[in-house]
């Protein structure tokens, strides 16, 4: 579960290294987000020469979460870290590579480009 002020690692090569969640999108009173949800973030750490800079406000989709997600068959999937991929308004990633595994739930939310770039889909 990601909420306001949560910090996430960035799982792409857009130039950002760490994000701070500003807002969870999808409803007026929505407090938490999980895998596959879009959030608004501020870039807290960035690498020099990247596409995004420190202080930029970006949209990101959550690809890994410490608090797992329950699947229809009753199983749960949890990850060791909270991670997100920076996306444009049309749900395409701003980076050209994805690092680490991503959850299968992204396919249900129409993030096919992220799923195809990921080295492993769990």
UniProtKB/Swiss-Prot annotation:
Function: Binds to 23S rRNA. Forms part of two intersubunit bridges in the 70S ribosome.
Gene Ontology CC: cytosolic large ribosomal subunit
Gene3D superfamilies: Ribosomal protein L14 (2.40.150.20)
Keyword flag Magnesium: no
Subunit organization: Part of the 50S ribosomal subunit. Forms a cluster with proteins L3 and L19. In the 70S ribosome, L14 and L19 interact and together make contacts with the 16S rRNA in bridges B5 and B8.
UniProt keyword terms in alphabetical order: Ribonucleoprotein, Ribosomal protein, RNA-binding, rRNA-binding
Name the record gives this protein: Large ribosomal subunit protein uL14
UniProt-listed SMART domains: Ribosomal_L14
Source organism superkingdom: Bacteria
Species of provenance: Halalkalibacterium halodurans (strain ATCC BAA-125 / DSM 18197 / FERM 7344 / JCM 9153 / C-125) (Bacillus halodurans)
Molecular function (Gene Ontology), one example: large ribosomal subunit rRNA binding
Similarity comment: Belongs to the universal ribosomal protein uL14 family.
Gene Ontology biological process terms from the UniProt entry: translation
């Amino acid at each position: 579960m990601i909420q306001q002020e949560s910090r996430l690692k960035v799982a792409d090569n857009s130039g950002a290294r760490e994000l701070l969640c500003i807002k969870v999108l999808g409803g007026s009173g929505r407090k938490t987000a999980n895998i596959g949800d879009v959030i608004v973030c501020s870039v807290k750490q960035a690498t020099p020469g990247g596409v995004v800079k420190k202080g930029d406000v970006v949209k990101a989709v959550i690809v890994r979460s410490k608090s797992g997600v329950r699947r229809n068959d009753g199983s749960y999937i949890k990850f060791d870290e909270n991670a997100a991929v920076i996306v444009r308004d049309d749900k395409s990633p701003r980076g050209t590579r994805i690092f680490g595994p991503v959850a299968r739930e992204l396919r249900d939310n129409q993030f096919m480009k992220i799923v195809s770039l990921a080295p492993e889909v769990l």
